[in-house]
Amino acid sequence: EGLGKVLRYGAYDDEVLARLRWMEKTLAPALSRALAAHGPLDLRSLIAQALQMGDEVHNRNRAATSLLIRALAPHLVRTGADADETAAVLRFLDGNDHFFLNLSMAASKCSLDPAAGIPGSSMIAVMARNGTDFGIQVAALPGRWFTAPAPMVDGLYLPGFTAADAAPDIGDSVITETAG
């Protein structure tokens, strides 16, 4: 979805819904075709390169997103429904520096899951926030949550909003911080 006026930040209007519908009807099928043509993506390699380029693949994903576009662009062009649609998909990806975040989150979770159940391990294997609680799971104790109240975030707000409008910390992307 990107940054700014998006559903995950609490925005919900016709513009947000139109973008989500476009993502469902146009972006997802285009990416599906391109991925089928490309074959499996080596996310570990993309992340390693992005880290060397200054990303930390949570709040900064510019390099990782650019590397992803570089990998998929030829396949988007080759499998695209038409030139205008392909151009719109590439513009969306290019204008969304956070596009890689979802892939980073999945890669982080997959890399951490094998740690679950290692006897005696004090490694933090999961961190999560749901707007009410902040929780962790320790590798030696899979499935057992240690929780505390989710803190309020001192962050930036969309125009017209203040800290009084905010909810406590929420989101699954903290799994990237768990992975380091």
Regions found by a protein language model. Give the residues of each.
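Accessory "access/gating" subregions that flank catalytic or transport cores
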Residues: 57-168
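Conserved phosphate/anionic-ligand binding catalytic regions in large, soluble enzymes, centered on
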Residues: 169-179
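Small-residue-rich
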Residues: 1-63
